[in-house]
């Protein structure tokens, strides 16, 4: 600072106040001001005295001690004023630029630039903190509804939703998130769309009526939209924002936590065209689709109403932990969850990570180290046979246990050429089997044909081992089998007969190999064709069971005929010996 003030201090103009710093030459003054002698000798030139004054006798210098009592300009100005606002102005100027002169245009532009750059820096690296601070400052009683409308539209970018916030938007700085308290979310064609602040009581009453009155969703004046509709109440939603993701077109949401979700999911108005393809309903990617880095959900209970007069049932989720949740890969991310557990129509289901350690008892044929296990216990079979062709569509009674293992290749598989070759061969064999199933003639697939192993990337394929256990099932011969060939139609009656004769317990094991691209834009088990592939694998398993059962029956007949022939020969030989 002395470099900037030197031209002003050496000016011949005399100032009415003491200079910036006065270093005394007198030992008495140095001891009074507690100034070290070394420092005093180095900067004596900053004194406001003239040369004759410095050479004056000591008695004249002692008279000026009272005028040199204050070290800085700020101290002198603070003593000269009694107004608290003037003192505040002096302190602010001194704190910002270590000077008491008025602000000029350069100072103001520097301050504005500093404020803008610092706020941009905070917004980029601490987006949630910046937004929560803005919300805290403008979240007054009059601005709450306007703020809820703008924030809701910016976060969801969905004009078809009606969202009501009963409580204010509260920034939670302890967890670094923004909290929405008591939220009501609705999607109905006759409900006003928008984001408002209001009461949650209407949503609670609608949810309670839906749980007790089955005819609620069938009322003529309730809804008639051809899409999934819902009325949901949420106790608390915590979100964190990420500016960098928003710039990259991945949505501004970074982490989302949902607690206490209740409501109704109504699909009674959903209709499909005849021979409609589920692939027509895949999500079309758009820049800005959310890609949540971490999704957590706890304490969920919903009532689900299915189309075609299917009975309503409840779906509950105790806790859900997803490492990522992307709108364009929704179903695939759910299958790769860290942990999901709950009930589906009073049937327990779990999705969790399963790891195998490298121990000496590990099966060498197991080529995959990491997997995600999906398990459903004691599920009613009518959830699988609704509108499905194949063996599941023929079964109209019974229960099923399902276990599915989503397999991921080992990280060390790339270094082991033999293991990688086995993985690629497995994928190639499954693809050939799938091609034979859906193609009537395949001339390239013959005894000497082998898949191009080098052209297959294991990371591009989705592998799932399915294990199904059917209990107390009952099947009927379908009236129309337009989706099956003549040869496959000939096996319908044997398969139905086998199911009814072994209805107590039927185990089915199969492996499904699909490309990961089949799950792009998929939200359900149907539009990803996973249900179709599962039904086809179950058909192949039943066909193998029927063939094995026929071979076993033929073998028993031959053994019985041979035993009867042997007994007759022994009897004839005995009669000959007696005669």
UniProtKB/Swiss-Prot annotation:
Residues 136-558 are mitochondrial intermembrane. One of its GO terms (cellular component) is nucleus. InterPro entries: Mdm31/Mdm32. Residues 1-47 form a transit peptide. It is a multi-pass membrane protein. Pfam families: MDM31_MDM32 (PF08118). GO terms for biological process: intracellular monoatomic ion homeostasis; mitochondrion inheritance; mitochondrion organization; regulation of cardiolipin metabolic process. Residues 48-114, 579 are mitochondrial matrix. The chain crosses the membrane at residues 115-135, 559-578. It is found in: Mitochondrion inner membrane. Keywords: Membrane, Mitochondrion, Mitochondrion inner membrane, Transit peptide, Transmembrane, Transmembrane helix. Present with 1200 molecules/cell in log phase SD medium. Interacts with MDM32. Participates in a complex of about 600 kDa. Belongs to the MDM31/MDM32 family. Involved in the organization of the mitochondrial membranes and the global structure of the mitochondria. Also required for mitochondrial distribution and mobility as well as for the maintenance of mitochondrial DNA nucleoids structures. This is Mitochondrial distribution and morphology protein 31. It comes from Saccharomyces cerevisiae (strain ATCC 204508 / S288c) (Baker's yeast). The lineage of its organism: Eukaryota, Fungi, Dikarya, Ascomycota, Saccharomycotina.
């Amino acid at each position: 600072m002395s470099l900037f003030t030197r031209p002003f201090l050496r000016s011949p103009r005399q100032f009415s106040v003491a200079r910036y710093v006065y270093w005394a030459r007198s030992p008495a003054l140095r001891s009074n001001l507690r100034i070290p002698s070394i420092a005093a000798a180095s900067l004596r030139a900053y004194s406001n005295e003239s040369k004759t004054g410095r050479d004056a006798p000591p008695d004249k210098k002692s008279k000026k001690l009272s005028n040199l009592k204050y070290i800085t300009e700020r101290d002198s100005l603070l003593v000269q004023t009694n107004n608290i606002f003037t003192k505040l102005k002096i302190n602010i100027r001194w704190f910002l630029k270590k000077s008491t002169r008025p602000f000029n245009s350069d100072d103001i532009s520097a301050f504005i630039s500093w404020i803008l750059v610092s706020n941009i820096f905070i917004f980029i690296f601490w987006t949630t903190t910046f937004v929560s601070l803005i919300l805290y400052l403008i979240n007054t009683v009059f601005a709450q509804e306007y703020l809820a409308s703008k924030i809701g539209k910016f976060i969801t970018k969905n004009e078809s939703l009606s969202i009501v916030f009963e409580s204010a938007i509260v920034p939670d700085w302890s967890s670094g998130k923004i909290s929405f308290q008591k939220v009501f979310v609705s999607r109905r064609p006759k409900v006003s769309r928008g984001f408002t602040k209001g009461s949650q009581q209407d949503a609670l009453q609608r949810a309670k009526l839906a749980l007790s009155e089955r005819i609620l969703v069938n009322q003529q004046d309730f809804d008639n939209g051809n899409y999934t509709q819902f009325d949901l109440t949420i106790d608390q939603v915590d979100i964190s924002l990420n500016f960098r993701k928003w710039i990259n077109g991945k949505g501004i949401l970074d982490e989302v936590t949902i607690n206490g979700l209740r409501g109704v999911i109504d699909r009674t108005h959903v209709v499909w065209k005849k021979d409609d393809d589920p692939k027509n309903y895949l999500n079309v990617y758009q820049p800005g689709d959310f890609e949540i880095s971490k999704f957590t959900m706890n304490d969920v209970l919903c009532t689900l109403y299915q189309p075609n007069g299917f009975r309503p049932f409840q779906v509950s989720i105790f806790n859900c932990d997803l490492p990522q949740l992307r709108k364009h890969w929704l179903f695939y991310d759910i299958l790769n969850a860290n942990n999901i557990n709950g009930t589906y129509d009073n049937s327990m289901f779990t999705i969790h990570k399963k790891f195998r350690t490298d121990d000496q008892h590990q099966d060498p044929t197991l080529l995959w180290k990491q997997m995600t296990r999906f398990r459903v216990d004691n599920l009613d079979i009518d959830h699988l046979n609704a509108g499905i062709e194949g063996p599941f569509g023929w079964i109209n009674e019974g229960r099923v246990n399902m276990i599915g293992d989503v397999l991921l290749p080992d990280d060390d598989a790339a270094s082991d050429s033999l293991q990688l070759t086995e993985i690629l061969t497995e994928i190639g064999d499954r693809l050939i089997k799938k091609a034979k199933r859906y193609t009537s003639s395949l001339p390239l697939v013959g005894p000497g044909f082998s898949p191009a192993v080098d052209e297959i990337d294991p990371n591009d394929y989705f592998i799932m081992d399915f294990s199904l256990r059917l209990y107390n099932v009952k099947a009927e011969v379908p009236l129309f089998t337009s989706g099956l060939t003549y040869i496959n139609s000939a096996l319908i009656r044997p398969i139905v007969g086998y199911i009814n004769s072994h209805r107590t317990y039927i185990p089915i094991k199969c492996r499904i190999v699909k490309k990961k691209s089949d799950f792009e834009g998929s939200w359900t088990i149907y539009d990803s064709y996973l249900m179709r592939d599962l039904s086809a694998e179950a058909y192949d398993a039943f066909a193998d069971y029927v063939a094995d059962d026929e071979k076993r029956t033929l073998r028993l007949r031959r053994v019985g005929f041979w035993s009867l022939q042997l007994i007759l020969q022994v009897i004839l030989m005995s009669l000959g010996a007696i005669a």
